[in-house]
Design a protein with these regions (language model features):
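Alpha-helix/helix-capping structural signal
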Residues: 22, 57, 112-113, 134, ...
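Cyclic-nucleotide recognition modules
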Residues: 75-130, 137, 141
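Cyclic nucleotide-binding regulatory module and flanking cytosolic helices
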Residues: 1-37, 82, 87-88
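Phosphate-/nucleic-acid-contacting segments
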Residues: 160-237
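Structural motif
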Residues: 59, 104-106, 208
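Short aromatic/basic micro-patch
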Residues: 18, 76, 108, 172, ...
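Cyclic nucleotide-binding regulatory domains
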Residues: 40-102
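Polybasic "coupling" helices that flank or enter modular domains
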Residues: 102-103, 117-185
């Protein structure tokens, strides 16, 4: 993680872009734009949170790590939301890790600044609470999907959610990383990705996934993707 340019492009984050001009004017001096690399740890499980992060081009995964070291993704956040909800929900720490899934930029804000603004009860508070409701839906639906649906359906859901949160058709990630996110064996991801290539939905070369036909991904995915997308669109439109 490193500081980016002084220019703060808050308009690329849906939550910040939805704020009224007077709130943005008040908050803008508190924003700092930073750049994340793939694999950067945003926060550790039960670690103290000093900042919240509003991704603009980065995607951040919320991961749960078991005692035996195995991991699974609970949810992901990109330009649709914020990382560090415990700071305004009253907890202060999170039981999961937050790790950068796709390199890019984010805007961070100090915890005390966010908490003070949240306490004013304005539009910022309303948006953060609505985002939290949408995130709860994503986490819940991920649990259902991981329990009931095939690896291929899970992979389609995951690719679509990731694609929604970046401004490109290319996703840079390895099959090993995807397997860790889904909590499945790498071999299962290899087979699923191979079939998606065969039907022309994606291409995969050396850690680079190109979305070739999004409609085919949507047709192959289970209902879980649409449930999550519809809820985000409803709450954050």
């Amino acid at each position: 993680m490193r500081a980016a340019s002084r220019h703060v492009d808050y308009g690329k984050n849906r939550l910040l872009a939805a704020l009224p001009p007077d709130e943005i004017e008040r908050l803008l001096p508190t924003f700092q734009q930073i750049s994340f690399s793939l694999g950067d740890v945003v926060y550790e499980s039960s670690g103290h949170l000093d900042y919240v992060y509003f991704p603009t081009t980065a995607i951040i995964s919320l991961l749960y790590t078991m005692e035996n070291g195995s991991t699974a993704e609970m949810g992901l956040t990109g330009n649709d939301g914020v990382v560090g909800i415990a700071l305004f929900m009253g907890g202060g720490t999170m039981p999961n890790r937050a790790v950068v899934q796709s390199a890019g930029d984010a805007i961070r804000m100090k915890a005390k600044v966010l908490q003070a603004e949240f306490a004013t009860g304005g539009e910022f508070q309303r948006l953060l609470l609505r985002y939290t409701q949408a995130l709860i839906t994503q986490i819940s639906q991920t649990a259902v999907c991981n329990r009931l649906h095939s690896v291929e359906q899970q992979l389609c859901r995951w690719l679509l959610l990731s694609h929604d949160r970046v401004a490109t058709d290319e996703l840079i990630m390895t099959q090993e990383l995807i397997a860790d996110m889904l909590g499945v064996r790498r071999e299962g991801v290899t087979v699923a990705a191979g079939h998606l290539q065969d039907i022309g939905a994606i291409s995969y070369v050396r850690g680079r996934i190109q979305i070739l036909d999004r409609q085919k991904l949507e047709d192959t995915a289970c209902e879980c993707y649409r449930v999550v997308k519809d809820e985000f669109d409803r709450l954050l439109k």
